Amino acid sequence: LDFNGGLMMLHYGNLQFTNATQLNDPFDCHPSLIDFSNVPKEACGGWTPEIIEELRRDPFRRTREEAWICSLSKIYDSILMWSYYSKHKGICIGLDMEKVRKSLSHMWGGTMIGCAEVEVQYKDIVEKPDYFRDAKDFFHYQISTKAKAWEHEQEVRLFILNPSPAYMALLPGQNDDKGPIDWKEVRAFPEIGGECFESVYLGINMDVEEKSKIIRVARKLNPDIKIFQMEIDANAFRLNTKLIE
């Protein structure tokens, strides 16, 4: 996360969910991950194969528009991810996933907040399954499959279908001055407990004042949170951590 994103996450104690159509990878959750073209005759029932193909594809198109995703990672020390997400000037936040799951599964304002969790699988597009012939959970496949180019991220996803407006919010700079905002551009920010925030990792190139702000806000959110400074390993191309007392 960059400084501002990390600061807001710690200040409000929430997670950010983004609509699948707004993710930075255009292949993400796309119906084209599944092959609908091999329509068997017995599936037509008097309709043309083209119509059946569209009818079967359409629910997956809607799923992509209705799914909001929170992208997490199993790792905190990827040089590549630190570089392209924040130029080593931001932070990485460690979560206690057992507590996150518990926090996201409760009643709030009469609305059940709950989300599903999937571990991303990385594949080549040529491996896409045949909808009519392969025995797969195609919904799970659509939500959890990404290109092998992303494999280094070791992503774990939380996702919500059609999140409640109660925890939707605009980002700074978003407004309706130029007309209505597309609902898919609005993020969901369900709140989780401070105990869910287990650790914070500070980037190597982080500004000193910004670092102090992060430490102060993190310890206010969870007095027991562990805070680490990322450091360069002098003997290898890797990052080390140093606990800040």
Language-model features and meaning:
Residues 1-245:
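Partner-binding and oligomerization surfaces adjacent to conserved cores of proteins
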